[in-house]
Amino acid sequence: MAGILRSIVQRPPGRLQTATKGVEPLVCVDWIRHKFTRSRIPDEVFRPSPEDHEKYGGDPQQPHKLHIVTRIKSTKRRPYWEKDIIKMLGLQKAHTPQVHKNIPSVNAKLKIVKHLIRIKPLKLPQGLPTEEDMSNTCLKSTGELVTRWLLNPADQEAKKC
């Protein structure tokens, strides 16, 4: 093989053109298997349908504002773009929930790594907490953000009397 290529390369340019007119290329790329490719699933598959809302209990007129995203599978042996998105979303540590907005830019990233993560809506039974209440909140495994109400010392003294 190397001898054939060497003899073709060492010939003058005029003879090289005549020698390669009827010759097909020696390297065929049709049989090469590319392990990872980006998703080519059409966007229509990801659009919500009325059946989905009935099945999962969502409301299309009042969508939830925040997602709880948890990584449930490893990123080992996954392509670099999935690892980059996991890092951007702050999901390097498995089974640690992160809160993200329900906006199209974040949803596009979540769609790429949907097979590695679990997404739940964040439920706010007591409403959205204020800045002062953020230190007194607790995120339950059911997806509820509960605000713990602290008692003021004046209230405690009034209750003792």
UniProtKB/Swiss-Prot annotation:
Origin, by domain of life? Eukaryota
- Per the entry, what span does the transit peptide take up? 1-34
Which GO MF terms are attached to this record?
structural constituent of ribosome
Q: Name one GO biological process term.
A: translation
Keywords from the named record = Mitochondrion, Ribonucleoprotein, Ribosomal protein, Transit peptide
What CDD domains does the annotation carry? Ribosomal_L30
GO CC terms of this entry: mitochondrial inner membrane; mitochondrial large ribosomal subunit; mitochondrion
Instruction: Tell me where it resides.
Output: Mitochondrion
Entries under InterPro entries matching the protein = Ribo_uL30_ferredoxin-like_sf (IPR036919), Ribosomal_uL30_bac-type (IPR005996), Ribosomal_uL30_ferredoxin-like (IPR016082)
- In which family does this protein belong, per the annotation? Belongs to the universal ribosomal protein uL30 family.
Assembly, in brief, is:
Component of the mitochondrial ribosome large subunit (39S) which comprises a 16S rRNA and about 50 distinct proteins.
The name of this protein is: Large ribosomal subunit protein uL30m
